[in-house]
Amino acid sequence: MLQGPFRVPSFNGYIPRRLQPWIYLLFAFIFLMSGGIYGGAMSQVMGEYSLMREDVLMIIMFNVVGVAMPFPFLFKMKFHFTNRQLLLNAALVVATCNFLIMWTDSVPLMCILAYIAGFFKLCGTFECMSTIQLWMTSKRDFTIFFPLLYCIVLGNMFLSPWVTEHLIYIYQDWRIINWAMTGALLLVAFIVYVTTHDFRFMKPLPFISIDYLGCTLWSAWMLEFIFFFTYGEHYNWLDSKIMQMDVLLFIFTGYFCIQRMLHIRHPYIEPAAWKYKRLVPLLILFAFVEFMGSTPKVLQTAFTGGVLHFGAITTNVLNFVEWVGALAGCLFCLFWCKVLCQKYTRLLTIGVATMVCYPVMMYFLINPGLNIEALYLPCFLRSFGNAIFFCMLTVYLEELMPFQHFFMGLTMAGIIRNGPMSAMCSGLYSFGLRYQMADNMSRGLPYDATNLLMLSIRNLYGITCLIGIAVLIIFLLWDVQPVRSTLKKMPSWNFVGKRMKKKKGFAK
């Protein structure tokens, strides 16, 4: 056993041991900040390339889907390549995608580059965080690891648009964030190249039994679903032949995904991974989180832009508030589990309650003379509850599934939360807002367009309140129990590698 401070084995000896895990934490932060087209640059990209809002959203969704897909491959890559090789390749690939996407106006090419960037940024993030997991929790405790992990993951989700919009405001060019992230990723690659060496803790496993076609099919299935709800309003839903064709493709792709899963030896997602008793309720909870989280994307944006007439820089402060809320929620999970020593499942009720506070407060706050400061508390509470749900549902998923299926489970959860549910809820809210506006105008109400919009937004917030309160009542009446009385520990990488070697038949 190593004595003294935690050490990353791949670092050269002249790097101080106390500094090594912090360097990897910085690498993970940079990987998570990176992307293809950044949400904060949406309006500038639309204006320069004459793209529709739906086009830019679809490019961003390709990046989000790309993040969800590498999970079943991660350990196969970890046990075949070295830490140095993985980080160098991930940093250079994501940097290349960030650079190339600035110089093309082809939406399909932008989508492909965004998907590749999302795929490899998750690979780089995983390699960084898995390397320093013993520094984060020497006892291999998931109730410590996941809250700390989501401090970075969810923190970047809200911090990235805040940084992007400020940089664009200062330099008046949407490409500045791509240049900044390309430079940061090249710096990561340079530091890794100079300060690390190839290190293996076990003999490499053959890089075989990789279901690339399965990954492609599941990705296409998710993206066809997202396409339907992203472009639904633009093409008038099923009245368009494009939407009808998309539905047919979605059905056929889903059929091929299932048939391939059932009939090959090493599928992308194993059939056994779908058979756990509590998996479906867990995926429904992930869907509920995405439903509650999609309200700001349509209703809050319509309210702040169409009623309050706030600009992007004014509303950008809400991203910072949500970042603070995400950090507070993750740290509260840590406090609840390790200081108060309470059951992690009880936190789900607190998470539901704080998330429901958001639409309830917004319902009563909607006013044409509202100050931006009045939105701080509801946005904070929504982000706080969202962080609790992400942390605790991931812990519950890890407790539910054995380790060999856990990373497949993360992709299954990603099928729900990484794009599809968000796109569906945003599309339905957009349809509901248009329907409410048309309905209110047809009634001949004595209001101008702004007041009709405000009334429509309040009605949709009211419907969201009712759904959220109904779910909260279910949680109050139904005491969700942990999967087991004692939490599992993270297995060591040597143990995982030996299990994989035995499963694939590489050992005698």
Predicted regions and their residues:
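Transmembrane-helix exit segments and adjacent C-terminal regions of multi-pass membrane proteins
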Residues: L2-G4, P9-G13, P446-K508
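Extracytoplasmic
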Residues: L2-R7, I15-L74, G124-T125, M129, ...
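12-transmembrane solute porter fold
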Residues: R18-S34, G39-G40, C97, Y268-Q436, ...
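Interfacial helix-cap and linker-helix signal at transmembrane-aqueous boundaries
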Residues: V45-G47, M77-F79, M110, W162-Q172, ...
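Short hydrophobic/small-residue motifs within alpha-helical transmembrane segments
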Residues: N63-V65, L154-G155, W323-V324, G419-P420
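Helix-loop-helix hairpins in multi-pass membrane proteins, especially solute transporters
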Residues: L74-L213
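Hydrophobic transmembrane-helix bundles of small-molecule transporters
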Residues: Y169-I284
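A membrane-interface helix-boundary motif in multi-pass transporters
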Residues: Y169-T182, Y231-K241, S430-G468
